[in-house]
Amino acid sequence: HLRRGPNAFGNKTVHKDNYSFTFLHSRLSLIDLNQRSDQPMEDDEGVICFNGEIYNFLELKKNCEEKGVKFKTSSDTEVLLKILNLYGPDGLKKLDGDWALAYYNKRLDKIILSKDRFSIRPLFYYDTGNEFYFASTITHIMKLMGSKSKLNFKRVANYISFGFKGTNLDPNAFFSGFNKFPTASYLEFNRGKKKAYKKYWSNIPQINSSLNYKQSVDLVKDKLIQSIKLRLRTDKNIGCSISAGIDSSIIAGIVKKILKKDIEFYSYAPHSKDYDESDLINLNIENLKAFNTHKYVTLPGGNPLKTLTDIVLDAGLPLNSPSDWLFHAICKSMKEDECTAFFTGSAGDDLFSGNYIDHLNYLVSIYKDKKKFEKAYANWDKKIKRLIRSPYLKDFNGYLRNIKNDPLASW
């Protein structure tokens, strides 16, 4: 099986005069393992169905209790339900977490769909005009619809042209008619009628130029520690991937040495010596004094093409990165060890502008502002371009043509 869960299932159907809807949920229990926290969860005011985790749920729970709200569980799901009961869509701004959610307000007869600030949790939809389907995977929607869809060849061409780094170029999915729910947004249905998508958060950088280098480093360190501390809130065993990379090494160090948590560590052991990082990994493990809780994982034997096919079919999209295959092997090992919650070092490139396609997307976004573009392009041409190995990502004009027209036009 490809997933760590599920360990519980639930459904809720509501029939109204002019429409009806059904929430379906399969649960991987992490917080409050009791069946009282299964989903969809319902109280007198609303119904919630969500995939994800609300990391600041204890702080939000205290806020609700101060307003007289009573709780029956110790789960983040119930806290999310109460927050949306109290604040509606404005409550999304209060959440620190990652989620794909569907919420129904009984009094207002309103449904809200939403996705987290960075699209960590997947959410796809298919809108026929009369029916609206949504799920964490495209394959689930196809099963609900009882039909299959044709490939979106323009999307496939983008993937072939730019690789996994081009998978976020547009909101369209790899199958025709399917779309990815927009990031940091929500959608309302009032009495069954769909309204426009709205943003609840925008990533507008606030630059503090007064900070020196040490202050900047200390600030990042403090933010990392606080973030990881919140994410340790779980009632299940915790694992952590560790490689020679700086991101996973930092996370492992904070968890083990600063927060003093005993967790299981997992590393990938490649068959090829060209990709062997074991010397640096072992130094990390020695420094953490974690040899007794560290495990090397290899890719499973058998038919690798079948494994790859299963992963792609389950997700409904190609791999974002070759490391997804390795991550699958580690997750399988974790499941065998009954280790459910997991820290992984990823997105460091995104945070510190290491993804070259992000530079190109920025240049495209300011292309019409001649003065701003010329300055940014000169900087990219001088400092960034020489570091790029892919010929496609070194050719800005070709990239621009693909974005503005059709990726097949340059073939």
Feature names for model-found ranges:
Residues 1-315, 327:
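Cysteine-centered catalytic environments shared across enzyme families
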